[in-house]
Amino acid sequence: MAMNFVTFNQDYSYLAVATSKGFRIFTTDPFAKSYETKEGNIAIIEMLFSTSLVALILSPRRLQITNTKRQSTICELTFPTTVLAVKLNRKRLVIVLEDQIYLYDIQTMKLLYTIQTSPNPNAICALSPSSDNCYLAYPLPQKAPPSSFNPPSHTPPGSTHVSPTSGEVLIFDTLKLEAINVIEAHRSPLACITLNSDGTLLATASDKGTIIRVFSVPDGHKLYQFRRGSMPSRIFSMSFNTTSTLLCVSSSTETIHLFKLSHPTSSPDASPSSPVGRDRSLSQSSSGYSPDRGDLTGDVGSSDFPARKHNGTLMGMIRRTSQNVGSTVAAKVGGYLPKGVSEMWEPTRDFAWFKLPKPNQTSGGSVNNGPLRSVVAMSSNTPQVMVVTSDGNFYVFSIDLSKGGEGTLTKQYSVLESNDRLGYSVTDY
């Protein structure tokens, strides 16, 4: 039996696992099997909070909405191409195809809107769990190349050249059915994005994986910038805790990072002389964009963003930056430099971290020669981080919220074994 897909529900109280022989649902605290079916090769599974409604992808183009309590099918939908991702909240059902996103009213299953996107084979997309701030985030569609565009010489004859995914994020209001902002998050293509439970914060990572950024939603102010590491790494999963004070990040390395989102003491209209005010004054524009004008902290593309009228001229940016002189030494020095250079003086590293155990080659998971993939979430009841890996293991790590530092593995289970209560506790309290 192979594990095809794994995900937490919106409040991290349940874990859903899709396999080649049905699917399983577990409670996370305490860890126990809640539901299981052994029929069907399930490609994708998504839950709606703690309800009995489950969305399943049974074949590449077919979606089934199921009531697990009644063991009945609510509806089935077939799409023109392969379904790459499914997102749910109490108002909307989102279906992500490679170049389209379908929005449904989850109460009536009526199709409300179809969004045309640039090719998005990795299904980079995030839907807020909030019914009030019901925002959808996805890569900004790229304009078609001009008629004079020449594809690379290595492109096969007759094929269509596809540009890399944008580093910009489009914020779409799924209640008003309109795009409301674009956030220029990275110069490199996006690799992972996530929204917090209130739909007020957006975390982004590019395909370099060295810098994690957090923006306010929907206005797009850059609030935090974190360094995961200096070497490139593929970001697999990012998750805010329920109070949005911590951000957990997993990648193709074995280290899981936790970053602290300390609330700024200054007001949103802070003076540009303060570090917070300086960041915000340079990250917002009249259109709500958040330009990335010089990321020299490890997430650097081959060139700057194309010049845009609302961003102003380069000399204008330098003049504005040179006027942002703070009271501290770092602020004084950084104020005379372009924003990307000044950010090198203020790197924000992880607050806590821990390393995953080495993959168990004898487990029933779909382990290959590539890096161990992982999905992370934080418990809403205890200071613990939950991690599910592609080899079928579920880990629980305890963290010290006051001191941070290295976390401790306390529990380990398998999501692929047949027992109702699985695994063992690493430490017996």
From Swiss-Prot:
Motif range (L/FRRG motif): 226-230
Topology within the bilayer: Peripheral membrane protein
Superkingdom as given in the UniProt entry: Eukaryota
WD repeat copies, ranges: 1-36, 69-114, 139-182, 185-225, 230-269, 309-355, 367-407
Cell location: Preautophagosomal structure membrane; Vacuole membrane; Endosome membrane
Bias type Low complexity, positions: 262-275
TM annotation in the entry: none
Family: Belongs to the WD repeat PROPPIN family.
Subunit relationships: Component of the PI(3,5)P2 regulatory complex.
Name assigned to this protein: Autophagy-related protein 18
Phylogenetic placement of the source organism: Eukaryota, Fungi, Dikarya, Ascomycota, Pezizomycotina
